[in-house]
């Protein structure tokens, strides 16, 4: 299982955004729509989609956990936005679960090295090629910031739990690009073995 954790501290947990204005009314909910498309639609080539999970932490109060939608896969950004909106309005499809929770609770759940490692995706971390050997001896989760990166509360948690930082290079990429790159990194290393 490969897991992505997208932090969205500014998004409202009420699901009250307008479909025609996702970045503005949704306070950058478009980031999550693109992550989901990268994770379950165009990102994986050989990696089993059933072995992917994407968690969105909304406003540090609400957790949406997305698994492979199968035949119900949304076809575009608005389709994903509808799924997110319905889930936040207590009408999730079977492949989305909704719960209460915070960034710290999710960190405690998935950062249990050496069995389970929570990596922070950060331009300034160790390059992914340097940690490649470690990736195969642990269950991996990758945490992503929003368009502004990580806020000060999250930075404090990253320091408190000593979360390792991993980089895809010095350039700042869209989080959807990071999701797809991590999946291809795993696909590539599986093919090498
Ligand atoms: C659009 S970027 C945020 C850019 C923001 N200017 C910043 O300073 O963090 C969204 C998230 O994608 C991830 N990210 C972007 N580029 C990356 C890279 N080169 N390596 C690792 N993670 C990256 C980080 O988690 C980042 O918080």
Question: Language-model segments: which ranges?
Answer:
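Glycine-rich loops and low-complexity Gly/Arg-rich segments
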Residues: 29-32, 79-82, 146, 167-170, ...
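Short, low-complexity, polar/charged sequence segments that are solvent-exposed and flexible
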Residues: 23-27, 73-76, 137-140, 162, ...
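Short, exposed beta-strand "edge-strand" segments with a Pro/Gly-rich flavor and a Y/T-containing core
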Residues: 96-101, 148, 161, 171-173
């Amino acid at each position: 299982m490969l897991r992505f954790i997208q932090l969205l501290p500014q998004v409202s947990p009420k699901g009250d955004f307008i479909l025609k204005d996702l970045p503005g009314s949704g306070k950058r909910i478009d980031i999550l729509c693109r992550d989901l498309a990268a994770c379950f639609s165009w990102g994986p080539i050989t990696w089993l989609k059933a072995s992917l999970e994407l968690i969105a932490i909304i406003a540090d109060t609400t957790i949406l956990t997305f698994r492979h939608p199968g035949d119900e896969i949304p076809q575009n950004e608005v389709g994903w936005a509808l799924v997110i909106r319905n889930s936040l309005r207590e009408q999730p499809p079977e492949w989305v679960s909704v719960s209460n929770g915070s960034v710290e609770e999710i960190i405690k759940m998935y950062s249990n090295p050496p069995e389970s490692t929570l990596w922070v995706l950060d331009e300034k971390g160790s390059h992914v090629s340097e940690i490649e050997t470690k990736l195969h001896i642990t269950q991996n989760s990758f945490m992503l910031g929003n368009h502004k990166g990580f806020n000060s509360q999250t930075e404090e948690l990253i320091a408190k739990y000593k979360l390792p930082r991993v980089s895809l290079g010095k350039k700042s990429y869209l989080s959807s690009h990071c999701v797809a790159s991590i999946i291809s990194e795993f696909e590539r290393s599986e093919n090498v073995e």
